[in-house]
């Protein structure tokens, strides 16, 4: 099981902005993170709409983090591009049980517990930590 490519790229884009600590244009972000410009712009639009990234128009335009990297978690980024993380569709409000059951079953209880644990872990990792650990690896 993997996160989507869009979430992977969104995490890279936020990392790029956190690491560089400056306003960057979409083309530079795209090149530095090896993400196509078109896909970068789509993701940046979602990140701006979610309030994680600020965009600026004009000569000195570009993108920068809307708040400090220490206040942006991996969970924030995944939610911005995909919505809430849930291991199984059966956890959604209108999720349909693929076996036709109604109510809560043993599988749903397990999927909910795992989803909550993954969300806690993703919410515990912020981009200041990631940048700091990357700097220690050099």
Question: What name fits each language-model region?
Answer:
Residues 44-45:
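Short, hydrophobic-biased segments on the C-terminal half of alpha helices
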Residues 66-138:
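Non-DNA-binding regulatory cores of transcription-related proteins
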Residues 51-66:
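Beta-hairpin "wing" of winged helix-turn-helix
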Residues 49-52, 80:
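Residue cluster at the C-terminal edge of the helix-turn-helix DNA-binding motif
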Residues 3-5, 9-35, 54:
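N-terminal helix-turn-helix DNA-binding core of bacterial DNA-binding proteins
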Residues 38:
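Key DNA-contact positions within bacterial/archaeal DNA-binding proteins
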Residues 31, 48-49:
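Alpha-helical residues within the helix-turn-helix
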